[in-house]
């Protein structure tokens, strides 16, 4: 039976640690994506899908972008709602394999690169925490440092938080599992695919 190459074993191990991210894996002058990530990125960005010998009988699906010009590609993926993990080469070699590590995760609400920012609008990340009788929320634009925190204990929590989401227009929402239950009753989440809840 064929066996994966050491580099591909490391890639898959890293991908297991970041399953919800598109993994930009640095190989020389390119960030490469493999397997499902390559298929997704190829489709979303209209890049050529190729293959790489990986130790298996079939070549691994692969696509890539130049490391010196990766920002526009990441920006397009972020705008489509994806998270991107940037995996860089280190100076270490172990068993003749260049070591790599994830140095950054870019999400719609954590963009700070001026190349990827739209200067005419804020880039808010919002957190919602729902308990039995109240809802708390915080939002921040990490590119400017603006931040706000509030709590609401009144009636009709669903309408209240819906109004706040529409007013703030966050690029990303993170929430606890109780707040996730609001997803089915918040009109803004039903009608605008921009708003996505990430449960933590």
Question: Where are the model-predicted features located?
Answer:
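Basic, polar low-complexity surface loops/patches
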Residues: 1-200
């Amino acid at each position: 039976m064929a066996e994966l190459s050491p580099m591909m074993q490391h890639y898959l191990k890293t991908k297991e640690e970041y399953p919800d991210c598109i993994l930009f894996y640095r190989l020389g002058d390119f960030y490469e994506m493999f397997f499902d990530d390559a298929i997704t990125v190829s489709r979303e960005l209209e890049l050529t899908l190729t293959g790489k010998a990986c130790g298996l009988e079939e070549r691994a699906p692969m696509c890539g972008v130049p490391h010196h010009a990766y920002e526009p590609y990441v920006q397009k993926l972020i705008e489509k709602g994806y998270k991107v993990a940037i995996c860089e080469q280190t100076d270490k070699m172990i068993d003749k394999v260049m070591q790599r590590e994830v140095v950054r995760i870019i999400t719609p609400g954590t963009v700070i690169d001026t190349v990827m920012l739209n200067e005419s609008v804020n880039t808010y990340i919002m957190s919602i925490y729902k308990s039995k009788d109240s809802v708390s929320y915080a939002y921040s634009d990490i590119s400017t440092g603006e931040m706000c925190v509030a709590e609401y204990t009144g009636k009709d929590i669903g309408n209240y938080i819906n109004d706040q989401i529409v007013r703030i227009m966050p690029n990303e929402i993170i929430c606890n599992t109780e707040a996730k239950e609001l997803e089915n009753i918040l009109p803004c989440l039903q009608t605008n695919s921009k708003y996505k809840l990430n449960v933590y």
